Amino acid sequence: GDCYMAVCGLPYANPAHADPVAALSLRILKELQLFNQHNGTHLKMRVGAHSGAVVAGVIGSSKFIYDLWGDTVNMASRMESTGIPDQIQVTEAFRDQLSKPFNLDFRGELEVKGIGKVSTYFLCDLPEEAA
């Protein structure tokens, strides 16, 4: 498919999970920009992030797969699907977990199916002095 999920803090909770997820998201977008410059392509990507508890486990009887379920997974998916190309859209819950001074811009409140209004932000960068 054209959608990939990355997680941090499994199988054990990691209270410092948001910073590496934010840094990875920024790095992926930067690498995509460099790829486009070097190859004359115009590939675009949306990234969404949310923080919270998930249910995780292995399913299957002949072909096993490790999978995740729950409201947190659904919200992260909504952040990606309602995002803007070449932007990282995050929830307030994710923003509140950041310990480094990442720059964020308030996008506004989005109506999220099955949840209601959710405050969202665009993750812009991490100032050099804080990296």
Where are these regions (language model features)?
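Broad gene-expression machinery/nucleic-acid interaction feature
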Residues: C3, K44-R46, V118-T120
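Residue-level recognition of alpha-helix initiation/capping sites
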Residues: G70-D71, Q89
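Short, surface-exposed loop/helix-turn segments at secondary-structure junctions
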Residues: I59-G70
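Short acidic/histidine-centered micro-motifs embedded in hydrophobic/aromatic stretches
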Residues: D2-C3, L24, Q97
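Active-site-proximal flexible loops/turns
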Residues: M5, G9, A16, G57-I59, ...
